[in-house]
Amino acid sequence: MELFDVYKRWNIEPVSGRGSILWDKEGTEYLDLYGGHAVISIGHGHPHYVSAVSGQLVQLGFYSNAVRNHLQETLAEKLGRISGYDDYRLFLCNSGAEANENALKLASFHTGRSKVLAFRGAFHGRTGGAVAVTDNPSIRSPFNATPNVTFVPLDDTAAVERELSGGEYAAVIIEGIQGVAGIRIPSDTFLQELRSLCDRTGTALILDEVQSGYGRTGRFFAHQWAGIRADLVTVAKGMAGGIPIGGVLVSPSFEASYGLLGTTFGGNHIACAAAIAVLEVIEGEDLLGHAERLGKWFREQLDGDPALKEFRGRGLMIGLEVKPEFEGLRERLLHEKHIFTGASGARVIRLLPALNLRWQGARQFVDAWKDLTKA
């Protein structure tokens, strides 16, 4: 059997990592400023994380949700306290797409409605409901297509108000920052108006913080810069250092009942041990503060750079839109400077490094950028 060929891969195979450094099987060293799509939030091989996961594996790796698992309760308590959502409840699953699926389902159960409002440029996942609210027809099969989803432009309050005025929508779903679209940030004012419109029309507000959450922007959730709270918040990527996990933070106004949601693997012992360790490192090492400081430094160094059309981002969720003549810069950073970055289209380089990226690594990137873009 061969692999089903759906991934465009670099011909590089990392075999070990420490902090923000990776080594391939030839021993070549790389600076990792992408973290496997914002997953590696505390760096590769953090000692506290390794100890927690290996220790749990020796004890018990998995049992289903047919029994009590105190690690789930510990994770919920820590996540609630650190995120500022301590009065909410946590449903654990296995990925960001699954978290969004369950959030959409909860919103529909809660409101008795079926329609969902989403935004141009949105990416919420590749499974049934999640891909239906993703603004990319090329990955939406006929099976996933539905008349129940409407897309409107980001930051267009009037368009949202027109759609919600009829009281037909179960939910509005929005990313804290649009990642795949190229680091597009909804304005604080727009998020505040969105919250107000949802309240007025009885519509659930879902904040997809799968990529933009877990401290990446310098706040635990990106939407907290706007001073709002969502009814449902979805999380996944930065939660557990690469061990599959996802979650939905659920408002107290939503009623739980046995069988309403469910999962076999969600909230298993290994995933919870990993997620608890990640939160302990984030809190213990003040990684929210570090992410905010380092993000400001990147902006000071690169905003206005001759190669840049626009610098976008908050904290360590950064989009560098280059001018047309620098379209191949990401590949040059990888092959000439051995620096992993992400992309959104041909001209946006995405930086999603570990939240504990050292200043030395940040300077290494800026020096490499300047060297490759100098006249």
What are these regions (language model features)?
Residues 1-375:
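Conserved N-terminal phosphate-binding loop of PLP-dependent enzymes in the Aspartate aminotransferase
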